[in-house]
Amino acid sequence: MGRSMDIYKPEGSLIDTPENREYLSSLASLEYAMNAGVVLEGRAALCDSSHALIVELGAYRGMIPREEAAYSIDGSEVRDIAVITRVGKPVCFKITGTVRGAEKPTFLLSRRAAQLECYEKKVSALRAGDILDAKITHIEPFGCFCDIGSGLIALLPVDCISVSRISHPKERFKAGDIIKCAVKSNDRQTGRITLTHKELLGTWEENAAHFCAGETAAGIIRSIEPYGIFVELAPNLAGLAEWCEGAVVGHCAAVYIKSILPEKMKVKL
């Protein structure tokens, strides 16, 4: 007991750690965690009719009331969908109290308190250029929503994923992926954080150094234009090939590298 945990990682990172399992192993350890204000994780087993989350705590159960299900910087009310979608997934929380029952106590939990601590001690201090782990929670055509700690969400726009153009983020990532990102902006008034990934993939020169003129390389067709076909050789490196019939965006292609022009940052294929 009392060992420190890196608790400000994306939600789900703590649940299988030895420390977390130890805290959930007995009534005494759960009470210790409550008194010490330790952030823990458990799996949300169900959402009841009042939209409270019931969480598995080893041999015990805990309840996160709807109003304690999430922290909002602007004070907006927790949406039903934000609670319901946590069912079956790990949730972070602090133990705030107990309700004594006939057989076992039920623990009162607050995910909001755990997220508030993460915001105050980590997220609010993030600055442009800071690098962090992010877990992709879901994907839309305009970008990826990412958990950057304790279920707090930031946006990775599609045009910040790579220099090479992609039509949809799913061409790079899927929900559940844990990736490295850099903070692009942090609006502390609205709580909106924007991430970028492409700067971590190396410069054009670093990517081009892996290829030489005269080589044949595998690439992915990213766009087809009247004047040629853009083929991605690496996430931050694409070249222009001559137009040919039968090319399909997203398909793999073998291309011959005609020339690499560092001064123009161009690759002719």
Predicted regions and their residues:
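Single-stranded RNA-binding regions, centering on S1/OB-family and related RNA-binding modules
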Residues: 1-269
